[in-house]
């Protein structure tokens, strides 16, 4: 699921949008420096 053009809330609940434009969970998507939007606080 791509998300870069649909920020700020592009992904399903519980997922983050990575700087590479994909939704996912974990540090690769949600971590500092990796997350573009809809990041976990």
UniProtKB/Swiss-Prot annotation:
CDD domains: ChtBD1. The keyword Disulfide bond applies. The keyword Plastid does not apply. It comes from the Eukaryota. One of its GO terms (molecular function) is chitin binding. Disulfide bonds join 3-17, 7-37, 11-23, 16-30, 35-39. GO terms for biological process: defense response to fungus; killing of cells of another organism. SUPFAM superfamilies: Plant lectins/antimicrobial peptides. PROSITE patterns: CHIT_BIND_I_1, CHIT_BIND_I_2. The modification Pyrrolidone carboxylic acid is found at residue 1. Keywords: Antimicrobial, Chitin-binding, Disulfide bond, Fungicide, Plant defense, Pyrrolidone carboxylic acid. InterPro entries: Chitin-bd_1, Chitin-binding_1_CS, Endochitinase-like_sf. Residues 4-41 form the Chitin-binding type-1 domain. Has antifungal activity against P.infestans, A.lycopersici, V.dahliae, G.zeae, A.nicotianae, F.moniliforme, F.oxysporum and C.gossypii. Monomer. This is Antifungal peptide 1. It comes from Eucommia ulmoides.
């Amino acid at each position: 699921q791509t998300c870069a053009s649909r920020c700020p809330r592009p992904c399903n609940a519980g997922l983050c949008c990575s700087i590479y434009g994909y939704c996912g969970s974990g540090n690769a998507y949600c971590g500092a420096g990796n997350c573009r939007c809809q990041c976990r606080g």
